[in-house]
A protein has these predicted regions:
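Central antiparallel beta-sheet cores of small beta-barrel/beta-sandwich binding domains
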Residues: 11-139
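N-terminal signal peptide c-region/cleavage motif recognized by signal peptidases
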Residues: 4-6
Length: 139
């Protein structure tokens, strides 16, 4: 039995998070920054940007360990050739990569697995926990 007010380790991260993905330019590939919402529930992160099945869509999922470490999986659809690296990559092409992240109670940081040196680039992730809604609980 848990004491009132005591959170399980995974629950300390639960809540709404603002996710910022930043990919710098590399060679002729333009850089970009995306901001999108994410949610951690029962120690599992899920974030989405865009419309599923459409160019520019990105979905990120993964379990956060009790110490805040996480290996997240990203799956998406290329928005535009100008932002994608690779010889055979164009708008509408599916892609995926892993993210190594570290969460604290109100913030987190992550880095994209760069993949092949010629094709990949060092994208970073910033996670910021959002305040609980003022409508939650009593007003």
């Amino acid at each position: 039995m848990l004491m009132p007010g005591v959170l399980l380790a995974g629950e300390k991260f639960d809540g709404s998070w603002l996710t910022t993905l930043t990919c710098p330019e590399k060679g002729k590939t333009e850089g970009y920054t995306w901001k999108f919402p994410g949610v951690i529930k029962d120690g599992v992160y899920h974030g989405e940007r865009g419309t599923a099945g459409q160019p520019g869509y990105l979905s990120i999922d993964g379990k956060i360990a009790d110490d805040g470490s996480a290996k997240l999986s990203a799956n998406g659809i290329v928005a535009s050739r100008q932002y994608a690296r690779g010889v055979f990559v164009g708008q509408g092409t599916d892609y995926s990569y892993n993210i190594k992240a570290q969460f604290k109670e109100t913030e987190g940081k992550g880095t994209r697995d760069e993949g092949l040196g010629l094709v990949g680039r060092p994208c970073t992730f910033d996670f910021v926990k959002q305040p609980a809604s003022s409508q939650a609980g009593g007003r």
